[in-house]
């Protein structure tokens, strides 16, 4: 009888006993597609670059800056100190990207800015003027100096509020009037509401003076200077500062005078103008910064408004002087007062004003107010990052206090102070400590603030000459602003100089040793994702963050790589964790509104995750998982058993030599699950194929997304190149090759061997008399040679017959239960092999033998 057998893909499962006829045990340089075995042509070398053994292309950075189109390979040299390089895709010269031996976990890019993400922070590289300029978060440090005008010796001004007799007397619970009004009044308790009115009336007199000049400041004003990025967000702060005008806390009640027939009250104070100067610590960031903005609150006297007893008496005349010594608020009340004061943007200055003194103006309370989410001063380190929807996603992250040189605000009074070595030990509420070593002037500003949450206190260790000093600052954790604030006040004047206590050299050196190795980590989360602002790699709004339970996130991948940016859908982003895969869904504003687990598959090789047109592929303990939306399937189940090594077959080397097929290329000896542990994948977009290779093996698997079947090719690859839609990889010679090679014209050598076939007669002995291989190919010699194997037990095989053409005839002899067909030859790219026709006869049991 005649059996028509169609050749299928490479399989290892089910076992040889249960497999179907036409399945392949060996498939060299062939892939099953369109019901045929098609040749896989060799990849073509592209570009001129040649990489050394330890050099790996981690990223391809492409873009357009002012009409200048660029496309660069970002290369990591894993030998030595781990240098990073860039090279034009058409060039061969490697140019260093200076990262100061920074350990990088992943690389991504947005526009012309590269982002190198590591555990200890993030490095950025800006492409401009044909080079990469690197910078990091601490490079945004800037110095702030405040100058007072007129100078500190400006005389006090007196401001008076006048009242009529009846109006004034109504302000007191008890009062008596002397018989002679010219002598004065003897007053009782000054009510809180009365004091509030008096101070308000005096303030009105002050405001009348201020109306003449918008640059004059009264009382106490708090403020902050913020460095402004290209998109209007803020990336660094000067810290909280104070504009302090002298206010005498004596409220004096005056007797009637010749010019005013009634009482009056007065207070003395100074009014000043202020100038502020900002200077950058480095010019690395000048192309990203557009200037700086200044936010101030409405000035406040900070006086304690409450009931006060009668003022002092004149001891000689026994008449009341009616002078009240008012108190300032302090401690918790002072901090609460500061928290309640909105900050208003009073000025915006551009880069031309950097390094110059600019005049400050008072806020009027209608300007734009400060939002704490506008400031992102902490650096962020992470296990990895991923760019999706035009936003940078960081996972398994740590927030790091990157600025070791504390941005002290310097006042006029500090200009003459000598610089000294400081160590700041910042103690957080959770018990964690952050150590900073820096050089600053010995005079500490009146208001000291840090962009650190839950900061309890800071111990300052100060060395000047041979002397060692110590001082502790206690902090208030602001509920309104992203600062921990420390304010020192004595009487009516904020301290601009702090008394340090003497300490010993040992204490200083112990803290110095800790500061040298401090990781500066403020907080961390293994189960959360920080999502940046759109088109900004450095700003991460709190509302954009999302968590995935208590799992540790190991990798992220978008549902579709080619159109991932700006896409919305049911499953736009997957998070691969140590407990399975989570699916994150976006709302219309690009914020993650929901998250849920998809499956319990754990990715075992996060560097090998691959994105195709409509699916994510990754390795797990079961094999390669294809994730499409909410559904998933294992595409390597057919390979999940013991692989077949053709070299164990009789006369295998002689047969392989006829087609110059290397024996190592058909020696499948590693189980697929072990193979996947170090495997990488490349997606051939144009052919809809997946190439799976392990650099330590001589064969690579190739999978057709159209047919869902496997083949193999020679493995000449050592690493992949992530550059969609090209299917690029680096070969063992260090050259970049394209797996999609439509211009190939040469013959492709191939070899395949089927799995055991029963020919529709299982467990029955049979004899094959002739065999013809069918397909679309020229009937030339060496197009298709045949070898026929037979066995009765699936383990011991004999070579029955061979042929140099597609025809195998004249076979006779002992019948067998199982047969294998091996074919060897070469095909042109357009040719293919479909199957075979077999003339087979079961053993005749009713014949004489």
Language-model segments: what does each one mean?
Residues 294, 489-513, 742-776, 826-849:
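Exposed low-complexity, polar/acidic, P/S/T/G-rich flexible segments that act as propeptides
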Residues 101-108, 373-381, 464-480, 790-841:
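Beta-sandwich interaction modules
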Residues 358-369, 516-551, 638-673:
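Surface-exposed loop and turn segments in beta-propeller and other repeat-based domains
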Residues 52-53, 100, 378, 549-552, ...:
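Conserved loop/turn at the beginning of each blade in beta-propeller domains
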Residues 83-94, 124-136, 408-410, 521-545, ...:
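Surface-exposed loop/turn elements that mediate protein-protein interactions on large endomembrane-trafficking
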């Amino acid at each position: 009888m005649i059996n028509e057998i169609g050749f299928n893909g490479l399989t290892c499962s089910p076992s040889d006993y249960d497999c179907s006829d036409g399945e392949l045990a060996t498939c060299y340089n062939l892939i099953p597609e369109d019901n045929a075995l098609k040749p896989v042509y060799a990849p073509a070398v592209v570009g001129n670059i040649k990489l050394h053994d330890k050099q790996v292309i981690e990223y391809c950075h492409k873009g357009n800056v002012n009409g200048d189109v660029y496309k660069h390979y970002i290369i990591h040299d894993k030998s030595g100190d781990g240098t990073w390089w860039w090279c034009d895709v058409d060039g061969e010269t490697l140019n260093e990207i200076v990262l100061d031996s920074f350990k990088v976990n992943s690389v991504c890019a947005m526009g012309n800015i590269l982002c190198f993400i590591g555990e200890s922070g993030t490095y950025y590289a800006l492409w401009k003027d044909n080079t990469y300029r690197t910078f990091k978060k601490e490079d945004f440090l800037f110095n702030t100096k405040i100058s007072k005008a007129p100078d500190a010796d400006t005389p006090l001004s007196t401001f008076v509020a006048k009242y009529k007799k009846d109006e004034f007397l109504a302000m007191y619970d008890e009062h008596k009037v002397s018989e002679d009004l010219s002598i004065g009044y003897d007053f009782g308790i000054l009510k809180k509401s009365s004091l509030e009115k008096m101070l308000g009336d005096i303030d009105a007199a002050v405001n009348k003076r201020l109306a003449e000049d918008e640059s004059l400041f009264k009382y106490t004003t708090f403020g902050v200077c913020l460095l402004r990025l290209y998109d209007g967000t803020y990336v660094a702060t000067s810290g909280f500062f104070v504009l302090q005008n002298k206010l005498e806390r004596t409220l004096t009640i005056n007797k009637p005078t010749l010019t005013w027939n009634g009482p009056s009250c007065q207070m003395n104070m100074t009014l000043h103008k202020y100038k502020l100067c900002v200077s950058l610590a480095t010019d690395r960031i000048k192309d990203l910064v557009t200037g700086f903005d200044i936010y101030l609150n409405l000035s406040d006297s900070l006086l304690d408004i409450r009931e006060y007893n009668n003022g002092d008496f004149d001891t000689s005349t026994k008449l009341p002087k009616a002078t009240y010594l008012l108190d300032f608020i302090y401690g918790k009340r002072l901090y609460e007062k500061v928290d309640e004061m909105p900050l208003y943007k009073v000025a915006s200055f551009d880069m031309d004003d950097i390094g110059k003194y600019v005049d400050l103006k008072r806020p009027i309370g209608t300007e734009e107010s400060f939002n704490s989410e506008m400031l992102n001063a902490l650096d962020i380190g992470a296990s990895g990052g991923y760019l999706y929807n035009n936003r940078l996603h960081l996972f398994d992250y740590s927030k790091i206090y990157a600025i070791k040189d504390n941005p002290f605000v310097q006042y006029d009074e500090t200009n003459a102070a000598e610089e000294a070595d400081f160590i700041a030990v910042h103690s957080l509420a959770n018990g964690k400590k952050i150590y900073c070593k820096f050089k600053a002037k010995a005079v500490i500003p009146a208001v000291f603030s840090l962009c650190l949450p839950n900061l309890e206190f800071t111990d300052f260790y100060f060395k000047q000459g041979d002397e060692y000093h110590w001082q502790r600052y206690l902090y208030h954790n602001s509920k309104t602003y992203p600062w921990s604030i420390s304010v020192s006040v004595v009487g009516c004047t904020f301290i601009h100089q702090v008394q340090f206590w003497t300490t010993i050299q040992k204490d200083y050196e112990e803290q110095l040793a800790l500061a040298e190795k401090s990781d500066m980590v403020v907080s961390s989360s293994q189960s959360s994702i920080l999502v940046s602002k759109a088109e900004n790699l450095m700003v991460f709004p709190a509302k954009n963050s999302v968590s995935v339970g208590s799992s540790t996130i190991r990798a992220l991948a978008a549902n579709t790589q080619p159109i991932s940016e700006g896409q919305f859908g049911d499953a736009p982003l997957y998070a691969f964790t140590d407990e399975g895969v989570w699916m994150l869904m976006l709302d219309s504003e690009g914020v993650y509104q929901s998250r849920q687990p998809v499956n319990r598959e754990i990715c075992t090789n996060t560097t090998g995750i691959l994105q195709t047109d409509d699916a994510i592929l990754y390795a797990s303990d079961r094999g390669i998982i294809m994730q499409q939306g909410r559904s998933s399937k294992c595409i390597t189940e057919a390979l999940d058993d013991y692989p077949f090594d053709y070299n164990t077959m009789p006369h295998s080397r002689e047969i392989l030599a006829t087609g110059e097929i290397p024996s190592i290329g058909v020696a499948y000896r590693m189980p697929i699950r072990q193979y996947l542990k170090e495997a990488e994948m490349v997606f051939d977009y144009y052919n809809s194929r997946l190439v799976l290779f392990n650099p330590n093996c001589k064969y690579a698997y190739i999978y057709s997304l159209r047919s869902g079947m496997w083949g193999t090719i020679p493995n000449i690859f050592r690493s992949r190149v992530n550059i969609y839609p090209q299917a690029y990889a680096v070969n063992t010679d260090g050259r970049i090759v394209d797996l999609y090679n439509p211009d190939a014209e040469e013959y492709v050598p191939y070899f395949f061997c089927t799995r055991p076939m029963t020919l529709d007669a299982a467990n029955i002995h049979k004899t094959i008399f002739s065999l013809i291989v069918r397909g679309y190919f020229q009937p030339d010699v060496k197009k298709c040679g045949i070898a026929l194997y037979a066995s009765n037990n699936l383990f011991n095989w004999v070579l029955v017959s061979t042929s140099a053409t597609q025809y195998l005839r004249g076979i006779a002899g002992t019948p067998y239960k199982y047969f294998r067909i091996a074919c060897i030859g070469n095909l042109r790219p357009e040719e293919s092999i479909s199957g075979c026709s077999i003339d087979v006869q079961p053993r005749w049991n009713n014949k004489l033998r």
